Design a protein with these regions (language model features):
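Charged alpha-helix within mobile-element recombinases
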Residues: 1-5, 133-217
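Retroviral integrase
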Residues: 1-166, 223-229, 234-339
């Protein structure tokens, strides 16, 4: 191939097959024994009482368990090493001491905005890295960095950051929360993320239960105190506490809808997949569901079309039996690994 021809050929980046799943993600272990950590931010914080006009920039530290995909969040009020270590100490006190902590490399964000780049100055300063590693050494923890300019190596925690940050920004908008309000909101958002169904617990059609990250943390599904629905109420009619409840409900609606869509195969109209069968546990895509409440149902009958493809099913729920299009349900992976 001559030089002119070679110059006109599109240059493709090197690629290879995806690696096998990391061993630490498939071995039996306690939650957060191997943990990924990342920052989401910056986010505005109000100093003092709710009516105070003094604000500052804070960030959110997100810890993700490699095995259970459980999420833990902490508010970090500054970019100093001491603030990160304080968040790390709170995490260890509540979730237990991890054996390995993985994080991004600061050079991944060399070309990012100044605010985002400032978050990772801590990870680029040799003295600050030494401070954090000295603390981890006393706790017998190992800290690993992913390769520079390789953010896809941290896809596990990047997905958690994206899942929370996108909807949190849309929910808060221009409102500025106090430290206590943000901590409370993040704790309940954390419960939302940890309540998501992962798979069916059994193949018994009369036991429609699912497994969630919350089961690994508290041994049972996460629940929440009931609250009035403030989703469509104007903000000027709500108290400060009701506004917080509205933000949480709006986050739940947006995030749960997005999560249910991710469970459905986007290529369902272009590529055939095995027909659904009776006895499958599914999630219902319904509007205005309460926070941390996932509507489950069991397929009792299927209705194939003339081409033999199932597009309508009969479902059994605690409230009765009815038909639904398969576009309104999301099948969960079964106990035997099938979908």
């Amino acid at each position: 191939m001559d030089f002119v021809t070679a110059a006109n050929e599109p240059v493709q980046p090197a690629s290879t097959c995806a690696p096998q799943t990391v061993t630490t993600r498939v071995q039996t272990s306690s939650p957060f024994l191997t943990t990924g950590v990342d920052y989401a931010g910056p986010i505005s914080l109000r100093l003092g009482p709710p009516r105070s006009k003094t604000t500052t920039k804070g960030n959110i530290a997100i810890f993700v368990c490699f095995v259970t995909k459980a999420v833990h969040t902490e508010v970090v009020t500054s970019l100093y090493t001491e603030a990160f270590l304080a968040a790390l100490r709170r995490f260890i006190a509540r979730r237990g001491k991890p054996m390995t902590i993985c994080s991004v490399n600061g050079t991944n964000f060399q070309g990012a905005a100044n605010e985002l780049h400032a978050i990772y100055k801590m990870l680029q300063c040799t003295s600050q890295i030494a401070t954090v590693q000295d603390f981890l050494a006393t706790e017998e923890c190992e800290w690993k960095f992913i390769p520079p300019h390789g953010p896809h190596f941290g896809g596990l925690w990047e997905a958690a950051v994206k899942s929370m940050k996108y909807h949190l920004r849309r929910t808060l908008g221009s409102q500025v929360a106090t430290y206590e309000e943000l901590c409370t909101l993040l704790a309940e958002i954390e419960a939302c993320l940890n309540s998501r169904p992962l798979c069916a617990l059994s193949d018994d059609p009369f036991n429609p239960t699912y497994l969630s990250p919350g089961h690994f943390l508290v041994g049972q599904p996460l629940t929440q105190l009931p609250a009035a629905d403030f989703t469509d109420v104007k903000c000027n009619r709500l108290s400060r506490w009701q506004t917080y409840q509205q933000q949480l409900q709006q986050f739940w609606q947006r995030w749960s809808s997005n999560y249910l869509q991710s469970l459905q195969q986007h290529h369902r109209w272009q590529r055939t997949s095995p027909n659904l069968q009776s006895g499958y546990l599914v999630l219902l895509r319904e509007d205005n569901t309460a926070s941390l409440h996932w509507l489950t149902a069991v397929i009792t009958d299927i209705h194939p079309g003339k081409d033999g493809i199932v597009r309508v099913v009969t479902l059994r729920t605690p409230k009765g039996t009815f038909k639904r299009s398969i576009t309104k349900i999301c099948p969960l992976p079964r106990a035997n690994g099938e979908l």
